[in-house]
A protein has these predicted regions:
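Beta-propeller folds
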Residues: 19-149
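Bacterial Sec-dependent N-terminal signal peptides
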Residues: 1-22
Length: 149
């Protein structure tokens, strides 16, 4: 009886496998690629996530429950001390009090790049350059959010 069950199961698997025809065109077009959301970064409270606006001028806070915009975390128009036209990416500090704003990104090789970074204080809405000595590569916040390496 077990042998019949295994044989029946194997035949069913073969039939379902033959139903799908995999073509080179489907593979090249990304038909079988996993879908994901780009640029979505969960926040500490677990209720919200942050995402860059389409025009790359704001970091917007959204609700996971409703998917609606809740607040604007960063806006190039309201940032004080420095004016930016837009930005490329951002890195939030572990306590979400500071944000590294990435601008003027220049690729080096494959996934490596240099960029000019600014430190944005969420509470004061002030924007200060990370360095006056040119672009940096891979800056990171310390676990206590007080230093940047």
């Amino acid at each position: 009886m077990k042998k019949l069950f295994v044989l029946f199961y194997a035949l069913m698997c073969l039939v379902t496998l033959q139903a799908q025809k995999v073509t080179l065109q489907d593979v090249a077009n990304g038909t079988y690629r996993a879908q994901s959301i780009q640029g979505l970064k969960p926040m500490l409270d677990g209720e919200h996530y942050a995402q860059i606006s389409k025009d790359h001028k704001r970091i917007v806070k959204y609700s996971f429950k409703t998917g609606k915009e809740v607040a604007t975390i960063f806006d190039v128009a309201t940032a004080r001390n420095h004016k930016l036209k837009s930005f490329d990416d951002y890195i939030m500090s572990p306590d979400e009090s500071l944000i590294l704003i990435q601008t003027e990104t220049k690729p080096i090789y494959r996934r490596s790049f240099t960029a000019v970074y600014y430190i944005y204080n969420v509470r004061n809405r002030t924007l200060e350059p990370l360095s006056n000595n040119g672009p940096q590569q891979v800056p990171l916040f310390s676990p206590d959010s007080h230093q940047i390496a």
